[in-house]
Amino acid sequence: MLRDLDILKRINEKTKAVVQMTLTTADESLCRIIEPHVCSTKERFEALKTLRDNGIPTVVWLCPILPYINDTRENIASILRMCIEAQVRGVICFGMGMTLRDGSREYFYRQLDRHFPGLKERYIKEYGDRYEIPSPRDDELMSLFHHTCEQSGIMHDNDEIFAYLHRFEEKEPFGQLSLWQLPRNE
């Protein structure tokens, strides 16, 4: 997206241009496993800071959070520190966990066997065929999430963030003159 920075800046001069991206883990090696075909966490963090420096607002999606893999206090706190430093406007989080559709589940389980031997059996035992796969640490991590965002002035209510994203903001660099401000021919 940074290759389009000039376009984003021009759009942002006229109206709000918000860039959104996911952050799943602060651990680079884990990032390559969880999201093998995307930019590294470090590259995304640098992009967030570049966007900030150019006045482009950003929103982070905190997902997926995989039970027993990246659902740690250290990981969530590290991601939130990045968000604070990058001055993101909001962080969208629907809870600590993930969803698994049929079809995706089989692929996911193969990847668990490949990268985290033995974890597939735990998932099957605890979650069965459920679509929603919540972290057993959801309450603790969501409390950390909300508290940290609140203390840092980062939007963390999903409805508030979506309202912000959908609110049209026209930017008029000079404003509109009222009838009484028009120059007179005297």
Label each region the model flagged.
Residues 111-186:
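C-terminal accessory extensions appended to soluble enzyme cores
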